[in-house]
C-alpha cells in the first residue's frame, strides 16, 4: 500500500493485478447484449395496458396497488346489482308489459298496457340518455356524469316510478269497475279472477322494479356525497 496526496491509498501492483487497459471489450459487449435481450423479453411479457392501469390507480391508491396479490383482479366484475339490473331491464319489465297486453286483450281494458309501455319506453329513453352522457364524457377523458347530468338522470329515474305507482294505485284500488272484477268476478266483464290477480301482481312487481332501479342510481351517489362531503361526478 502506498499513500498519495489528499490521504488516499492505492494498492501496489502485484502478480494478481489486472490492468484496466487489458480488459477485453468483448465482455462489455456480451453484457450489453444480455441486457438488451432481457429488456426485449420483458417488453414482450409486460402488458402495457395493465401497466398504465396500475400507474393510474396508484395516483389514487398509492403504493398499495403495487402490493396487491397476483390472485387479486383489479378489473371491474359483474356484481350482483349489475345482474339484477339486467334481469329487471330486459326480462321483468317486458314480462310485465306482456301481462298487461294479455289483460288488455282478455278484459278489453288497455289502461295498464298503455301505462306500462309508456313508463317502459320512458325508462329506456332515460337509460339511453345516461349511456350517451357517459360515452361523450369518457371520450373526452372526463368523469362519466357531470353534476348536472347526475341531477337530471336522477330526476328522470324517479319520475317514472312515481307516475306508475300513482296511476296504477288509482286504477286498482279506486276504480269501481276494477274493484267489481276483484270482488264479484263478474262474468259479464269478460274476465276472471286469475287474470285480475295476475295483472295486480304484475303491477306490484313493476312498481318494485322501478323503485329499485331508481334507488340503485341515486343511493350510491347520495352515500358518496354524505361520506366525502362533496359531489363526485360518476
UniProtKB/Swiss-Prot annotation:
Location(s), subcellular:
Virion; Host cell membrane; Host endosome membrane; Host Golgi apparatus membrane
Protein name stated in the entry:
Protein UL20 homolog
* Gene Ontology CC annotations of this record: host cell endosome membrane; host cell Golgi membrane; host cell nuclear membrane; host cell plasma membrane; membrane; virion component
State if Transmembrane helix is listed as a keyword: yes
**UniProt keyword list:** Host cell membrane, Host endosome, Host Golgi apparatus, Host membrane, Host nucleus, Membrane, Transmembrane, Transmembrane helix, Virion
Question: What family is this?
Answer: Belongs to the alphaherpesvirinae UL20 family.
Which top-level group of life is the source organism from?
A: Viruses
Gene designation per UniProt: MDV032
UniProt source species: Gallid herpesvirus 2 (strain Chicken/Md5/ATCC VR-987) (GaHV-2)
Write down the InterPro entries for this protein, in alphabetical order: Herpes_UL20
Amino acid at each position: 500500500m502506498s499513500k498519495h496526496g489528499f490521504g488516499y491509498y492505492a494498492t501496489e501492483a502485484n502478480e494478481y493485478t489486472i490492468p484496466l487497459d487489458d480488459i477485453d471489450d468483448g465482455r462489455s459487449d456480451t453484457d450489453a447484449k444480455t441486457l438488451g435481450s432481457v429488456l426485449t423479453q420483458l417488453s414482450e411479457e409486460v402488458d402495457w395496458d395493465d401497466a398504465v392501469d396500475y400507474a393510474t390507480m396508484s395516483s389514487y391508491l398509492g403504493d398499495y396497488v403495487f402490493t396487491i396479490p397476483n390472485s387479486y383482479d383489479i378489473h371491474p366484475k359483474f356484481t350482483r346489482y349489475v345482474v339484477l339490473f339486467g334481469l329487471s331491464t330486459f326480462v321483468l319489465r317486458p314480462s310485465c308489459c306482456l301481462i298487461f297486453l294479455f289483460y288488455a286483450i282478455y278484459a278489453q281494458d288497455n289502461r295498464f298496457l298503455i301505462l306500462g309501455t309508456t313508463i317502459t319506453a320512458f325508462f329506456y329513453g332515460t337509460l339511453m340518455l345516461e349511456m350517451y352522457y357517459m360515452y361523450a364524457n369518457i371520450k373526452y377523458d372526463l368523469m362519466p356524469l357531470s353534476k348536472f347530468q347526475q341531477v337530471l338522470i336522477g330526476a328522470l329515474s324517479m319520475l317514472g316510478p312515481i307516475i306508475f305507482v300513482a296511476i296504477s294505485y288509482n286504477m286498482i284500488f279506486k276504480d269501481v269497475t276494477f274493484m267489481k272484477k276483484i270482488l264479484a268476478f263478474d262474468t259479464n266483464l269478460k274476465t276472471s279472477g286469475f287474470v285480475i290477480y295476475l295483472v295486480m301482481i304484475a303491477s306490484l312487481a313493476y312498481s318494485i322494479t322501478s323503485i329499485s332501479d331508481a334507488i340503485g342510481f341515486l343511493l350510491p351517489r347520495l352515500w358518496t356525497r354524505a361520506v366525502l362531503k362533496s359531489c363526485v361526478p360518476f
